[in-house]
Amino acid sequence: MGYFSPRLIAQLGISLFASATWTVQLTAEENWTRFRGPNGSGVSTESDPAPTTWSATENLKWKATLPGPGSSSPIIVGNKVFVTCWSGYGVDRSDNSDQSNLKRHLICLDRYTGNILWDQTVAADLPEDEYGGMFAEHGYASHTPVSDGKNVYVFFGKSGAIAFDLDGKQLWQTKVGTGLDGRRWGSASSPILHNNILIVTAAAESHAILGLDKETGKEIWRAEAEGLGSTWGTPVLTKNDEGKTQIVLGVPYEFWGLDPETGKLTWYCEAMNSDSYCSSVIEHDGIIFGIEGRGGGSIAVKAGGKKDITQSNVVWRGRNNNRISTPIYYDGRIYFFSSRVANCINAKTGEEIYQERLPASTTTNNPAGGPGGGRRGGGGGRGGQDYGSPILADGKIYFVTRNGDMYVLKATDKLESLAVNRVTSDTEDFSATPAISKGELFVRSNKHLYCISTKN
């Protein structure tokens, strides 16, 4: 049993029932309503053709100026795009302003024109984490919103979880903790929805996962454990053969399966040998895949069962490593990117299919953090890491590096680059994962939100 499991058993409890699993059924839709779209898979369920080439003058439908930076992703709900930002403090490393000026924003834009329809600001609860160190790699707007098509839910760290309707009216605000991250990395896990429950991973704030009533913000359950303090990934959902949904989350050394109705731990599994979990797990046909850095390796686990499922449910273990971005599953293969290297492995066996460096860009632009992968620098932050995750649509993989190189790769068993695009020659930081809807890509930087489309 992993390092945190004894504490978990006491704090979360064990719900005992047998569990075989399959994928949550998803229908094709024109919305992209959470981090990495349908169940966090990063894979579009649409059939619309997606663009392959673009530039500042080709297939760029619109460009909107944002009121501040952020590394959260945009989401799309009908004819509206939502994205979060921050302003007033810590906008860059030369900013000497006071924390009391810190504000977070939820921005709503018209998806067809890029016009800002409304901007709701939320003052920060102080003290906040100081801007600096690794915290400056992603900042104060790292959590991607989530929507049920009726309302939009945001997680603003110590300022709590907040619900707005689609016209920008605030419905409720619930505080989830005021803890400061001892590592000074902050928190980044995005909220997700299950039926009427908003699930918030308040890792730094309270070392807890919370289930909130999405209509009122009232706390339904809270599951606390020290292991959550070093978790930055976003959970996924899976179902068992009885039709019961489980939350699955990667934490240091382990995977956890929890009941979303109660927050109780149903199963756990020894996973990667890493004291932190930065990326998110992904799920396909009841198999949970994880790839971590810091020497953690990779793993596939059949979700379900009860208590410790390490001996019974591990499908394979591998030595592949990843740092920040989350993988994607497609057509029996798993794709992921780390330090400008494209990786593809067999999802059934974990065996490597290819590992090749991405083609060189035609530009040497780097964001202001420093050349060649400095803090908030091009080609990734610490150690040259890119923070955005790949997504897939129309049989093509889209991956955006921090300096704005936008790769389009064919999703096949060999590295086949279709294009390397850019939307700007300016110095901007692209730390967010793109979104896609109706064949249109939405990509945000620390300064702008871009809509890339072949449609008029």
List each model region and its residues:
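N-terminal secretory signal peptides that target proteins for export/translocation
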Residues: 1-8
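Noncatalytic, solvent-exposed loop/strand surfaces
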Residues: 25-456
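Bacterial N-terminal signal peptides
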Residues: 10-21
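Intrinsic structural disorder/low-complexity segments
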Residues: 6, 14-15, 28, 305
